[in-house]
């Protein structure tokens, strides 16, 4: 630090004063280059006054530069106030440096205020100051203000340059505003401002965030055509854009083209490609590129492992998913809740509920990873698929509260489905009824699973009641909901209700499927309405639906009950199965003329 020499008097000779001032300036400038802002401020505020030196503009601006380099916007603003208090008017450099300090921290309000103060100090905002303010707005998520500042620069007689445009395009990229970003990129060329790699990269990333993979790739190709030298960031953004839109083939092509462009793929390149393959369940390719990381001298990180585990999960490769999860500690990679959630989900898809529970309740806690909604929901769903309704309820009602995890709609839906599959309609009804009290809004899936549970237990009144509640809750019933209620009424002998609900589906613009028709045909069979059964079964091919073994069996029974033996013989003679399974579809041969003739006398079920 700069100190006064021993034996000095109360006043310094003019040349000594100049020497000390030069030394102080040099020291502050050195601190500024190293971003040592505290040392610079201490020298400015303490040591210079102790040497009876009044800090001048150069010393203040150097100290402001130290704050800017360290991203310390608050001390920078305080220094400006100090200058005003000393009647030392800040100049354009002072303001520009302070605004730049704000830009790095996204303090756009303070940056705008400082720019607004400049005219009151008879200072005109310059290119550096305005570009820094644009950058501050971008960092603060204020892309509209950034664009306004850029467009307002000519009014202040300031011509935007490459830095100004890049700051604005970067602001648009952070806001996923791909259209204005493309527009500014074109405008740069029109204004004879040559876009650089930063301009193109920000535009590619903006398109990627806006899921515009074609435009991302187009901009990348434009870079190559104009010799703008794309780098790994350019390719990584384009690969990510393709991956987000499930264009995994193009992601792979871009990765493999990087060496030809003399660009070495980095870990981000590989991770983005693995993620692209993961989204489409291309687990073999994901494994290939994961294995390519060490061959390229790169170490897989948490993102790499999470992507490959998720790829295995989507590809039904639960053993591989668990293998990669177990490898993470040896690779010195910390598994996260994402890693475990993907592995648990892999076990869930394979109905390996014991493994799912072991991961959730044992291994996660042993590795110090806190379970979350995703991991708990996957475990509940694993229990549902494994027929373990008691364990599903235990996770929802006991373990999640202990873990301080609030169940959401997916948690309840999985538990209700578990109860439905376990013929536990009472629990399904209770869970659905409890959801609003816990601040969870039942969805169409919640209602459908509960209605299905009631249908399986023969509680047609409850099924019908929940269908009504569903409408009251403004949850749109689906074909699944209606199928369950129609089937419930049909099985309980409520054939009029079953047929009435079936007809309502058309009014609600719901498309009946094979299940809907089979339930309606079953209602006709129970009520001996053979004409209606025939009309329904002949209607199915018109909707691109083929009757299956159940449809034919129910219609045949309806004919038998009504003593329609000639019709039955003709009907069966005109049908043949497609395939060998009893659930296979059936179709009619041209010889079924009697069945078609009888259809003319059949009526719409009522």
Task: Locate each region found by the language model.
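Acidic, glycine-centered low-complexity repeats within long intrinsically disordered regions
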Residues: 35, 50-52, 122, 155, ...
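Methionine-biased hydrophobic packing positions in alpha-helices, especially
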Residues: 47-48, 83-86, 118-121, 153, ...
């Amino acid at each position: 630090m700069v100190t006064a020499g021993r034996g000095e008097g109360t006043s310094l000779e003019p040349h000594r004063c100049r020497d000390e001032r030069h030394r102080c300036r040099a020291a502050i400038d050195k601190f500024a280059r190293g971003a040592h802002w505290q040392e610079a401020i201490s020298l400015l505020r303490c040591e210079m006054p102790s040497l009876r030196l009044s800090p001048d503009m150069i010393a203040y601006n150097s100290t402001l530069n130290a704050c800017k380099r360290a991203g310390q916007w608050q001390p920078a603003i305080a220094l400006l106030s100090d200058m005003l208090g000393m009647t030392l008017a800040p100049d354009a450099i002072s303001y520009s440096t302070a605004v730049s300090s704000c830009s790095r921290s996204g303090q756009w309000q303070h940056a705008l205020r400082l720019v607004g103060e400049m005219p009151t100090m008879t200072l005109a905002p310059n290119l550096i100051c305005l570009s820094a303010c644009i950058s501050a707005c971008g960092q603060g998520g204020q892309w509209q203000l950034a664009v306004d500042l850029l467009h307002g620069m000519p009014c202040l007689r300031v011509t935007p340059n490459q830095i100004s445009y890049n700051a604005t395009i970067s602001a648009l990229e952070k806001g996923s505003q791909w259209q204005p970003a493309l527009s500014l990129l074109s405008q740069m060329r029109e204004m004879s401002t040559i876009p650089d790699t930063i301009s193109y990269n920000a535009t590619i990333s903006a398109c990627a965030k806006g899921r515009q993979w074609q435009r991302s790739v187009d901009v990348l190709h434009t870079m190559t055509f104009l010799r703008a030298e794309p780098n790994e960031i350019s390719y990584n953004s384009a690969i990510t854009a393709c991956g987000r839109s499930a264009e995994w083939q193009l992601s792979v092509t871009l990765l493999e083209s990087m060496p030809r462009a003399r660009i070495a793929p980095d870990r981000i390149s590989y991770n983005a490609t693995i993620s692209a393959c993961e989204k489409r369940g291309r687990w073999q390719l994901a494994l290939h590129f994961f294995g390519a990381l060490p061959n390229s001298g790169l170490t897989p990180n948490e993102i790499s492992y999470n992507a490959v585990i998720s790829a295995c999960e989507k590809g039904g490769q639960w053993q591989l998913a668990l293998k990669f999860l177990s490898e993470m500690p040896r690779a010195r990679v910390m598994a996260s809740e994402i890693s475990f959630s993907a592995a648990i989900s892999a076990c869930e898809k394979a109905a390996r509920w014991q493994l799912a529970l072991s991961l959730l309740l044992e291994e996660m806690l042993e590795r110090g990873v806190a379970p979350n909604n995703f991991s708990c929901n996957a475990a509940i769903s694993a229990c549902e698929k494994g027929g373990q309704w008691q364990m599903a309820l235990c996770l929802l009602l006991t373990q999640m509260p202990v873990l301080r995890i609030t169940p959401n709609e997916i948690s309840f839906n999985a538990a209700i489905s578990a109860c439905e599959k376990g013929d536990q309609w009472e629990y399904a009804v209770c869970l659905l009824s409890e959801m609003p009290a816990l601040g969870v809004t039942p969805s169409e899936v919640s209602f459908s699973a509960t209605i299905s549970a009631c249908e399986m237990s023969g509680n047609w009144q409850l099924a019908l009641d929940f269908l009504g509640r569903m409408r009251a809750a403004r949850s749109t019933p689906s074909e699944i909901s209606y199928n369950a209620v129609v089937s419930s009424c049909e099985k309980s002998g409520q054939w009029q209700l079953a047929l009435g609900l079936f007809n309502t589906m058309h009014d609600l613009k719901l498309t009946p499927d094979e299940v809907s028709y089979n339930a309606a045909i079953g209602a006709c069979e129970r009520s001996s309405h053979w004409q209606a059964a025939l009309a329904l079964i002949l209607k199915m091919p018109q909707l691109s639906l083929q009757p299956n073994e159940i449809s034919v069996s129910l219609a045949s029974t309806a004919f038998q009950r009504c003593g329609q033996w000639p019709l039955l013989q003709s009907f069966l003679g005109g049908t043949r199965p497609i395939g060998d399974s009893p659930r296979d579809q059936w179709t009619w041969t041209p010889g079924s003329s009697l069945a078609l003739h009888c259809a003319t006398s059949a009526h719409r079920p009522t």
